[in-house]
UniProtKB/Swiss-Prot annotation:
Name of protein: Inorganic pyrophosphatase
Origin organism lineage: Bacteria, Pseudomonadati, Pseudomonadota, Gammaproteobacteria, Pseudomonadales
Residue numbers binding Mg(2+) 2: 71
UniProt-annotated binding residues for substrate: 30, 44, 56, 142
PROSITE patterns in the record: PPASE
Tagged with keyword Cytoplasm: yes
Gene it is expressed from: ppa
Class in the EC hierarchy, top level: hydrolase
Organism annotation: Pseudomonas putida (strain ATCC 47054 / DSM 6125 / CFBP 8728 / NCIMB 11950 / KT2440)
Keyword line: Cytoplasm, Hydrolase, Magnesium, Metal-binding
């Protein structure tokens, strides 16, 4: 499969495609899809024994502030296999900075055609409060034991900000 041939979404910025790299609650292994070879590589074994609280991936054909495709966490009832692509709807964004610069994480739920479980989730604040806290705690601490790496949480914004980040990253990719 060539991720570069997958559009960023079906109805941008409301309906996006996310290539999953790391399933929710998976062993603390950081996988990354190499954008040139479309191969799923082990990037590193995480030093902190923490699990991603939701499926982690990126929107194809986007370019975020850190020079990589825009990161997305997709909240689902079950872990999604690495390498698969899921249709999703953005509901918020966790703004953060790390050792590589700006590193926002869009928060999304499956498109309504995939699951009716999240039909009433319009904003990230509609998700369980504990899940929101777990996501923030994970990203605030997941690099703690890695030399030279750091993360600063800048705060949360809603679905409008997530859609704006998607639109910006699509435009940046197109140059």
């Amino acid at each position: 499969m060539s991720y570069s041939k997958i559009p960023a979404g079906k109805d941008l910025p409301n309906d996006i495609y996310v290539a999953i790299e790391i399933p929710a609650n998976h062993a603390p292994i950081k996988y990354e899809i190499d954008k040139d070879s479309d191969t799923l590589f082990v990037d590193r074994f995480m030093a902190t024994p923490m699990f991603y609280p939701a499926n982690y991936g990126f929107i194809p054909n986007t370019l975020a502030d850190d020079g990589d495709p825009l990161d997305v966490l997709v909240v689902t009832p079950y872990p999604v296999a690495p390498g698969s692509v899921i249709r999703a709807r953005p509901v918020g964004v966790l703004n953060m900075t790390d050792d590589g610069g700006g590193d926002a994480k869009v928060i999304a739920v499956p498109h309504d055609k995939l699951s009716q479980l999240y039909v009433d989730v319009k904003e990230y604040t509609d998700l369980p409060a504990l899940l929101i806290q777990q996501i923030e705690h994970f990203f605030a601490n997941y690099k703690d034991l890695e030399k030279g790496k750091w993360v600063k949480i800048e705060g949360w914004e809603g679905a409008d900000a997530a859609r704006a980040a998607i639109t910006k990253s699509v435009a940046a990719y197109k140059g």
